[in-house]
């Protein structure tokens, strides 16, 4: 199959001006194949275009990349949402997962680069908050949220917002009708870890009549139903860790969950749960969960505002959040999420959004890729096999041109120098 066939297939799924069509489709096709590093030099060598064309496209047309991600995610959601099926063993039909990832940079010199605490140290780079939609076992990335540092906001005359404020604005303005059509808000569950345990986020979700399962910090204030009815609103709150320690009458229950891996292992959790109140939010189900064969350091406290859900459904539903971690692994390992060397943040933003476009396109059944191919790496290898003869045709065309032999020798020398 010729590369032009694949580029035509890509162009038909996007609304891009004809002037930018070739460079955008060439960059997307480059991201959709296997390569050691997704650099502009490699993109130019792969497509036959000049490096400056990709550089100008990334620097000057970030809005095109953003709008393309939004249109592709809506098309994919409409394609896979009919009919909507319940999530595995759960009462909800769709899940929205909120999680952040860090894009590493070598230094603080690029625009909007910042030090972020991560694990036992720090990471220099950019932070992206990802919002992904899970429907019918399909993960669909929505437009990511970039974090703007205070110096960058000052230089660009932008109002500074924290990461939590950005998430609140995003969820408040997210209209799922544009993605899946009419739906019942009670079928939506929002999943987030303790990094997004914020009353404003939880109230924004509740105001949209959605459900949430959020891992709360051990110092989050809660109150039992009995105390809520008999004490003033401002008193008798205690940390959730102390709450479960003081309510030892709540018995431990063991649940068994099958993993989603190839080996299908069984995990055992022991849980305690009760109804209570989350301060500044309202009535929720409180769950204390920990692996049965691990120490207390792995203990999690979950809050769910769906009163009809069982404790087992809450624990199993929260485990769906792991799919976004696998998504982060795929875009970093296969699609070159961190392979960016530009100093301007507009170029970084364009590259990230084109990476998301490539991820969506690989799951939209490109020509030559059979549906039984599931992994993102396998899909890339299949696309590369379909384009296998493209490099031979490019070399023969270059050698037949005037001065083509010398230009091809220079290209080989450059490739050997980069290796």
Model-derived segments and spans:
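Short, conserved catalytic/metal-binding motifs centered on acidic residues
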Residues: 43, 92-106, 131, 187-197, ...
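Long, charge-rich low-complexity segments
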Residues: 72-83, 395-419
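Short amphipathic alpha-helical "interface-anchor" segments enriched in bulky aromatics
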Residues: 102, 230, 241, 245, ...
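An internal, acidic/charged active-site-proximal segment
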Residues: 152-284, 369, 373-378, 383-384, ...
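Basic, amphipathic alpha-helical segments enriched in Lys/Arg and hydrophobic/aromatic residues
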Residues: 339-393
């Amino acid at each position: 199959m010729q590369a032009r066939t694949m580029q035509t297939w890509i162009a038909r799924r996007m609304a891009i001006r004809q002037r930018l069509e070739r460079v955008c489709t060439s960059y997307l096709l480059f991201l959709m194949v296997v390569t050691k590093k997704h650099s502009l030099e490699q993109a130019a060598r792969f497509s036959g275009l000049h490096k400056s064309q990709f550089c100008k496209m990334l620097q000057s047309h970030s809005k095109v990349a953003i709008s393309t991600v939004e249109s592709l995610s809506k098309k994919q959601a409409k394609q896979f949402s009919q009919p909507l099926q319940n999530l595995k063993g759960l009462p909800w039909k769709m899940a929205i997962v909120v999680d952040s990832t860090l894009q590493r940079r070598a230094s603080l010199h690029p625009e909007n680069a910042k030090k972020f605490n991560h694990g036992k140290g720090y990471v220099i780079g950019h932070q992206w908050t990802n919002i992904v939609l899970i429907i019918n076992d399909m993960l669909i990335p929505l437009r990511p949220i970039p974090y703007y540092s205070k110096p960058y906001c000052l230089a660009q005359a932008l109002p500074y917002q924290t990461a939590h404020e950005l998430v609140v604005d995003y969820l408040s303005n997210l209209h799922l009708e544009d993605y899946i059509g009419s739906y019942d808000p009670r079928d939506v569950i929002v999943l987030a870890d303790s990094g997004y345990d914020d009353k404003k986020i939880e109230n924004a979700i509740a105001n949209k009549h959605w459900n949430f399962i959020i891992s709360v910090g051990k110092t989050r204030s809660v109150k039992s139903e009995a105390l809520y009815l008999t004490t003033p609103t401002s008193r008798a709150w205690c940390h959730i860790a102390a709450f479960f320690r003081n309510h030892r009458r709540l018995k431990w229950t063991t649940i068994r969950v099958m993993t989603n891996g190839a080996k299908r292992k069984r995990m055992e959790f022991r849980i305690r749960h009760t109804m209570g109140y989350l301060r500044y939010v309202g009535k929720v189900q409180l769950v204390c969960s920990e692996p049965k064969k691990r120490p207390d350091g792995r203990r999690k406290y979950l809050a769910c505002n769906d009163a009809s859900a069982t404790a087992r459904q809450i624990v199993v539903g929260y485990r769906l959040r792991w799919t976004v971690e696998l998504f982060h692994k795929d875009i970093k390992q296969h699609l070159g999420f961190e392979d960016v060397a530009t100093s301007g943040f507009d170029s970084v933003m364009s590259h990230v959004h084109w990476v998301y476009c490539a991820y969506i396109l690989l799951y939209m059944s490109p020509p030559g890729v059979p549906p039984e191919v599931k992994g993102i790496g396998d899909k890339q290898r299949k696309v590369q096999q379909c384009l296998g003869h493209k490099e031979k045709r490019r070399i023969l065309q270059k050698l037949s041109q005037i001065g083509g032999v010398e230009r091809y020798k220079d290209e080989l020398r450059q490739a050997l120098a980069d290796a």
